[in-house]
């Protein structure tokens, strides 16, 4: 659904979520 440009950014956010216990931060 998201453009390819956001694909790498999305992967980065997913990694941050694993480090951070706050899932809301990713959705923000």
UniProtKB/Swiss-Prot annotation:
Residues 1-18 have a biased composition (Basic residues). This is Uncharacterized protein YFR012W-A. Residues 19-28 have a biased composition (Polar residues). Residues 1-28 are annotated as: Disordered.
